[in-house]
């Protein structure tokens, strides 16, 4: 488990009571059942859904429907938003995988239940975005309400996406600069395939996640803060820019790969053309030498004192004539 997420309370990673002023206090697993929230307070619980005790708490003590629990605990999810009625909703998001040995595009699922005064989030693998939110709360500059907890989580998830896509674009810039600086330089095809696969993996989850932000900007739940829509619209715009950047990255990679393919094809064509010219040049001379060397009724000119030099002169004449013909035909 990552150092930035270390829960040892039977699946509860973080428990926090928000005081409505950007800060709050931590709560342990045993305190949850006896909490008595003040009117301005909200509760945020962050769980490791891979721990059986966390799953048991969700089903037995969270007060959620079986349908909601099944969705929160299912194995395979895609980013989506579900209105559960009664002023509550489920939000399924994805974050960049920064765990050791993992591929960043293998995005980590974050499942969130939220209502007016409570947010329950679950993950299987650690997410740095959650730790960033906790740091804000510890510093007294974090979310003040349940709706802001959901927004802060989405905001920090999007920050990681921004950084990752900028890194991909920078790597591609370096490849393009290398190719432009030296016409003979070949781009690293393995690197291009990796960048293309990474871009496709990110796009798979970011496109539906952008739609979630757009939906949340239009939601009119009573516990949403008045300016929430503006913040969700900004996140929607950021993800839209990221998706456009991913599309541009894909096009740039395609251009590099097509240019390299054309370069290889042209080099092969030049090589084949050169081999064809060489073959065409020496074929008549090979015919003459083969004809002179045929051992039927004796070798022509074998008894002549200058036979060898005459044969060389004949071959030289054929070569000169061929060179003249090739030049006239612009083959050389």
Swiss-Prot record:
- So where does this one cross the membrane? 278-286, 308-323
Q: Where in the cell is it found?
A: Cell inner membrane
For this protein, the record's InterPro entries field holds:
CorA_cytoplasmic_dom, CorA_TM1_TM2, MgTranspt_CorA/ZnTranspt_ZntB
Those parts of the protein on the Cytoplasmic side are: 1-277, 324-332
GO cellular component terms attached to this protein's record: plasma membrane
The reaction(s) annotated as catalysed by this protein in its Swiss-Prot or TrEMBL entry are: Zn(2+)(in) = Zn(2+)(out); Cd(2+)(in) = Cd(2+)(out); Ni(2+)(in) = Ni(2+)(out); Co(2+)(in) = Co(2+)(out)
Output the Gene Ontology terms for molecular function.
metal ion transmembrane transporter activity
The function of this protein is: Transports divalent cations including Zn(2+), Cd(2+), Ni(2+) and Co(2+). The proton gradient has a small influence on transport suggesting that the transport is probably not proton-dependent.
**What family, per the record?**
Belongs to the CorA metal ion transporter (MIT) (TC 1.A.35) family.
Protein name per its UniProtKB record: Divalent cation transporter CmaX
Source lineage: Bacteria, Pseudomonadati, Pseudomonadota, Gammaproteobacteria, Pseudomonadales
State which gene encodes it.
Answer: cmaX
């Amino acid at each position: 488990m990552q150092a930035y997420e270390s829960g040892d309370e039977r699946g509860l990673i973080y428990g926090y009571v928000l005081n409505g002023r950007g800060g709050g206090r931590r709560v342990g697993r045993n305190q949850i059942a006896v909490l008595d929230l003040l009117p301005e307070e909200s509760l945020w619980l962050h769980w490791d859904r891979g721990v059986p005790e966390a799953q048991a708490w969700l089903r037995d003590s969270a007060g959620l429907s079986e349908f909601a629990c099944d969705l929160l605990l299912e194995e395979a999810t895609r980013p989506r938003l579900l209105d559960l009625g009664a002023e509550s909703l489920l939000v399924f998001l994805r974050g960049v995988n920064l765990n050791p040995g993992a591929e960043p595009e293998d995005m980590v699922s974050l499942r969130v239940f939220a209502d007016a005064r409570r947010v329950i989030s679950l993950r299987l693998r650690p997410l740095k975005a959650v730790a960033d939110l906790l740091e804000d709360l510890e510093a007294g500059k974090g979310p003040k309400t349940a709706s802001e907890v959901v927004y802060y989580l989405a905001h920090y998830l999007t920050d990681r996406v921004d950084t990752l896509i900028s890194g991909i674009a920078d790597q591609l810039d370096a490849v393009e600069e290398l190719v432009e600086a030296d016409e003979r330089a070949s781009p690293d095809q393995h690197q291009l395939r990796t960048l293309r696969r990474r871009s496709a993996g990110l796009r798979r989850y970011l496109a539906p996640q952008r739609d979630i932000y757009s939906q949340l900007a239009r939601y009119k739940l009573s516990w949403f803060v008045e300016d929430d829509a503006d913040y969700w619209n900004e996140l929607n715009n950021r993800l839209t820019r990221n998706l456009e950047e991913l599309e541009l990255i894909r096009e740039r990679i395609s251009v590099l790969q097509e240019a390299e393919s054309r370069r290889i094809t042209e080099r092969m064509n030049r090589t084949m053309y050169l081999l064809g010219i060489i073959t065409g040049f020496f074929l008549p001379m090979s015919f003459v030498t083969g004809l002179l060397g045929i051992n039927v009724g004796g070798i022509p000119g074998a008894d002549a004192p200058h036979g060898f030099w005459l044969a060389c002169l004949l071959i030289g004449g054929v070569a000169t004539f061929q060179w003249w013909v090739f030049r006239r035909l612009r083959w050389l």
